[in-house]
Amino acid sequence: MGGCMHSTWDHALHSRGEPRPSEAPASISAPSKMPKSVSISKQLASIKALKKGSDLEKAIATIALVFRNASDPDGKLGKATAKKLLQTQFKKFTEREETKPKYQDILSELDEHTENKLDFEDFVILLLSLAIMSDLLRNMWNENTMK
């Protein structure tokens, strides 16, 4: 993504052959995919380490499962697929945002250079960028402060 660059330190480590912090070991980053017919909630329930996990841990695991189910065998997500995921699974955060210049910039990046793919880190940054600017998040915070 345009404004999402790895740090110089990160680049130096990677150039020496060390994995980037966002890259999991091959055994973790490329697990066998569950059939698409298995719901995310069932996949999440099958992860033993999360049986007593916190809501935040389960939220991150859910994002990882959605990404993994939609990604290609190399663990990358095509920009068209990412855009479709946003439209189908993140629509409460993106609806009525179309007129915001920042939203338009983010989405136009998904339309450009479609041969480029997103790794998990870029996908999470994309989600967080859209969530942070969304009216839904602002409304949630306003409702919680009044209670």
Swiss-Prot record:
Keyword Protease included in the entry's annotation: no
Protein name (Swiss-Prot/TrEMBL): Sentan
GO cellular component: cilium
Taxonomic classification: Eukaryota, Metazoa, Chordata, Craniata, Vertebrata
Species whose genome carries this gene: Mus musculus (Mouse)
Keyword Cell wall biogenesis/degradation included in the entry's annotation: no
PANTHER family in the record: PROTEIN S100-A1-RELATED, S100 CALCIUM-BINDING PROTEIN
Feature: compositional bias, Basic and acidic residues: 8-21
Molecular function GO terms recorded: transition metal ion binding
